[in-house]
């Protein structure tokens, strides 16, 4: 053990003793000091004070010397850590009031060391107090029989996890000295497609670990555990972990409160009584000290306390938007489930609503709801900030309730089946093309049986995840938040809940966990909603990825995002199409928004955008220097750049040359995915039934700022509509590139000139383009940009073909795949037909197995 780690270990052990001694009301010791490798403390509970000294060596805890001021010649040599030594002294003093008790400990330890080796030693105790000292400390230094005091319910829950998910689905790290255990639940995420996993910054071949820090001997009867979420290989930058950690902490906190009932196990009862009698019982009832975390999980005291409460300082402010946690009383439970929560059988309305459910742990199970359109509550701005019905399914429909009253009222014990479901958008979420979600009726589902939960994650995703169309997209969030029945123990329930939430994380705000509101369903990349408190938390608490990281890994994509933002701002239709408007915290006043969707100032946004250094220059100089230059020119330039990057909800990757479509004749080719796992899996299921093909979608470059953040929408008969809707409402596609080029703003003269009339100016332009090599050619050189997307479309009866113009009314049947950008009037071949065999084959080659088309 190195010197640095040795000192840290000693200091941690001393902190454990000091912290918990001070927390005990009748502590017998005071004057704790540590200097020159000696830890001293004074006994003040007797007729006279006695000082004890613990001298540590370089190979601590080996060769540790213990003595007292009453008998400093007789020294104890031990291999025990400081907390164990202290606990045994305190126990002996309480029992015997003998200030020389150190000697009795010495004799016992010497006898023990003479009989057995250190690794296999078990201290032969004559009293319950000394048995407690073994239980007090266990970190690998003592071969403590952990099975002896491990809570029986914990053993049962661990066995259930291993039986259902396999022996590698859970692992333990026990810390018996402080009555703590780390339970690592391994959540399989291999069901994610590779490109989706990359978009979420998740390693799909490696499980996500949900770590619970809880009491080893008390388990469900102990303090609420803290939660960590991480992947071993991505601990440093695991953005998805921030969101999932908040979700799982809230879930665990709520379920812990529901389950805090004493076990009937006699062993647990005796153990609890013994802990109360222990002189330093606080040592075994508190969780591990914040100064003694497992490797890689260090936390300050303040952070640990915040997590124990299940809510951060900023998140407390978000409580006014209504907690997203679903109480046990609010969840889908079977009539027979009475052990871990109140049975719903007392409410006849609940019994009547019980129906069957599809058997799979990844089903987006809707919470019980019987929604009537006339019961939908219209929320005004600043009332409830678009509170989802998943926050509390039993909310009564009282329009006179003010937010604080609504959030603090005690709910009736009877399950109320009428649901608040239809919500009008809050001002902060209002978008020009957005409409209130339609109210719909959902069924009350039962929990799938255990056999159903054995199915693989991949099979569960195909065809059964709730569609994310405008009329039914609201069902998925409620199903994902529905609490699984605890029929196989708390740990299995926790895994099931994590498996429910992970595929639909993109549908919820990363801060408040309320569902996003979009007209045509959720997008791919998780991000923050537009509620002001969430924006503040997202931009100031380190949840948002740094622009420097994004530029380092995808500079060409950032360059494209900035160009799209500029095109939307310069458009005469910016009032309609520049959505979402930026929400940016003022760097000089973190309590204010410099760019506020409720107070739009397009000129100020353009000024900040003009001050952003070109992305190409950012890649050629130290990023911090570039940032300083931008801050001097305009303090809002860099925050705006951060927003442009973080608000993008689509996954865009610059295609390498070997994966580009040669017939598109542009170096600016991108993989563009905007469909979340649920939509991709539904798309895949539909493809198996009906097949699919490819078609182009043309739209002006100015529209793509919004499309990347809100998806392809049916603009027909809305103010977003730019062209006529001759063939009805839907997304317009074409297998012919020439038609889609027209929709993108390229006129026919440009296309003919580029292909059939090589004028001198065109020749010089082509020559100039061909001479650009290396990094220069990777970035956009012009602000005169045109673009076209290549989409995959389901060939079902819903696809209406009118010659070379196709109309798809169902947005779930269209998934973007590629995006092509052209500069200065340059275009690709205007006569490309995706239905030609060679073209279709080339598209499939480039896509490969990276998306749901595989």
From Swiss-Prot:
Q: Which UniProt keywords apply?
A: ADP-ribosylation, Glycosyltransferase, NAD, Nucleotidyltransferase, Transferase
User: What name appears for this protein in its UniProt entry?
Assistant: Protein mono-ADP-ribosyltransferase PARP8
Q: Name one GO molecular function term.
A: NAD+ poly-ADP-ribosyltransferase activity
EC number(s) recorded for this UniProt protein:
2.4.2.-
Map out region (Disordered) in residue numbers.
Answer: 113-138, 291-310, 750-777
List GO terms (cellular component aspect). Answer: endoplasmic reticulum tubular network; nuclear envelope
Q: Name one GO biological process term.
A: endoplasmic reticulum unfolded protein response
């Amino acid at each position: 053990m190195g010197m640095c780690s040795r000192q840290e270990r000693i200091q941690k052990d001393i902190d454990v003793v000091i912290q918990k001694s001070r927390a005990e009301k009748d502590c017998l010791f005071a004057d704790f000091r540590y200097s020159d490798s000696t830890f001293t403390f004074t006994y003040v509970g007797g007729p006279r004070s006695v000082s004890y000294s613990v001298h540590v060596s370089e190979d601590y805890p080996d060769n540790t010397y213990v003595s007292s001021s009453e008998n400093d010649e007789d020294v104890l040599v031990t291999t025990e850590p400081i907390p164990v030594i202290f606990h045994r002294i305190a126990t002996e003093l309480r029992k015997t009031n003998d200030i020389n008790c150190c000697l009795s400990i010495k004799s016992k330890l010497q006898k023990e060391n003479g009989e057995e080796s250190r690794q296999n030693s078990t201290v032969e105790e004559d009293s319950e107090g000394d048995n407690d000292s073994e239980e007090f400390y266990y970190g690998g230094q003592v071969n403590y029989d952990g099975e002896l005091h491990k809570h029986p319910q914990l053993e049962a829950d661990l066995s259930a996890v291993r039986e259902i998910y396999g022996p590698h689905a859970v692992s333990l790290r026990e810390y018996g000295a402080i009555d703590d255990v780390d339970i690592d639940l391994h959540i399989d995420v291999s069901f994610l497609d590779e490109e989706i996993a990359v978009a979420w910054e998740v390693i799909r071949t490696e499980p996500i670990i949900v770590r619970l820090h809880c009491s080893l001997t008390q388990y469900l009867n102990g303090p609420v555990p803290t939660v960590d979420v991480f992947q071993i290989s991505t601990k440093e930058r695991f953005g998805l972990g921030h969101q999932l950690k908040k979700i799982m902490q809230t879930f665990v906190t709520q379920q812990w409160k529901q389950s805090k009932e004493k076990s009937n196990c006699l062993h647990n009862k005796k153990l609890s009584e013994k802990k109360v009698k222990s002189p330093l019982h606080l040592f075994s009832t508190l969780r591990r000290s914040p100064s003694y975390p497992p490797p890689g999980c260090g936390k300050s005291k303040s952070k640990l306390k915040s997590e124990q409460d299940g809510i951060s300082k900023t998140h407390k402010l978000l409580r006014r938007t209504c907690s997203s946690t679903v109480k046990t009383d609010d969840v889908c439970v079977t009539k027979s489930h009475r052990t871990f929560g109140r049975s719903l059988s007392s409410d006849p309305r609940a019994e009547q609503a019980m129906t069957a459910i599809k058997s799979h742990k990844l089903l987006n199970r809707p919470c019980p709801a019987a929604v009537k359109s006339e019961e939908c509550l219209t929320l005004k701005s600043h009332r409830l900030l678009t509170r989802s019905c998943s926050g509390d399914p039993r909310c009564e429909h009282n329009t006179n309730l003010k937010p604080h009253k609504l959030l603090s009222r005690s709910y009736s014990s009877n399950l109320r089946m009428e649901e608040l479901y239809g919500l009008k958008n809050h001002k902060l979420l209002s978008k020009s093309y957005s409409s209130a979600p339609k109210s719909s009726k959902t069924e009350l589902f039962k929990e799938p049986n255990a056999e159903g939960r054995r199915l693989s994650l991949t099979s569960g995703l195909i065809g059964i995840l709730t569609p994310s169309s405008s009329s039914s997209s609201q069902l998925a969030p409620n199903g994902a938040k529905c609490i699984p029945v605890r029929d196989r123990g708390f740990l299995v329930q926790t895994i099931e809940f994590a498996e429910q939430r992970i595929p639909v994380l993109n549908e919820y705000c990363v801060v408040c966990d309320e569902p996003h509101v979009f007209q045509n369903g959720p997008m791919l990349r998780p991000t923050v909603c537009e509620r002001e408190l969430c924006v503040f938390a997202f931009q100031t608490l380190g949840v948002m990825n740094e622009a420097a990281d994004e530029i380092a890994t995808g500079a060409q994509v950032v360059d494209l995002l900035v160009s799209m933002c500029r095109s939307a701002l310069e458009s005469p239709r910016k009032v309609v199409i520049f959505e979402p408007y930026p929400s940016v915290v003022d760097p000089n006043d973190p309590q204010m928004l410099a760019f506020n969707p409720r107070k739009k100032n397009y000129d100020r946004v353009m000024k900040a955008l003009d001050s952003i250094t070109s992305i190409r220059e950012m890649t050629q100089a130290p990023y911090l220097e570039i940032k300083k230059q931008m801050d001097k020119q305009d303090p809002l330039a860099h925050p705006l750049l951060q927003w442009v990057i973080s608000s993008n909800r689509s996954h865009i990757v610059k295609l390498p040359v070997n994966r580009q479509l040669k017939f598109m004749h542009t170096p600016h080719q991108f993989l563009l995915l905007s469909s979340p796992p649920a939509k991709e899996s539904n798309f895949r299921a539909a493809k198996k039934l009906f097949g699919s093909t490819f078609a182009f979608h043309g739209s002006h470059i100015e529209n793509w700022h919004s499309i990347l953040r809100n998806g392809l929408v049916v603009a027909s008969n809305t103010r977003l509509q730019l062209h006529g809707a001759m063939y009805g409402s839907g997304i317009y596609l074409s297998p012919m590139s020439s038609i889609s080029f027209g929709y993108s703003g390229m006129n026919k003269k440009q296309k003919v000139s580029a292909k059939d009339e090589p004028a001198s100016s065109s020749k010089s332009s082509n020559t100039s383009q061909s001479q650009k090599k290396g990094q220069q050619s990777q970035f956009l050189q012009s602000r005169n940009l045109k673009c076209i997307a290549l989409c995959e479309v389901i060939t079902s009866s819903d696809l209406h073909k009118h010659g070379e113009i196709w109309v798809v009314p169902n947005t779930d049947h269209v998934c973007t795949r590629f995006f092509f950008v052209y500069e200065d009037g340059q275009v690709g071949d205007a006569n490309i037909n995706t239905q030609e065999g060679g073209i279709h084959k080339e598209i499939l080659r480039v896509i490969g197995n990276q998306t749901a088309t595989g």
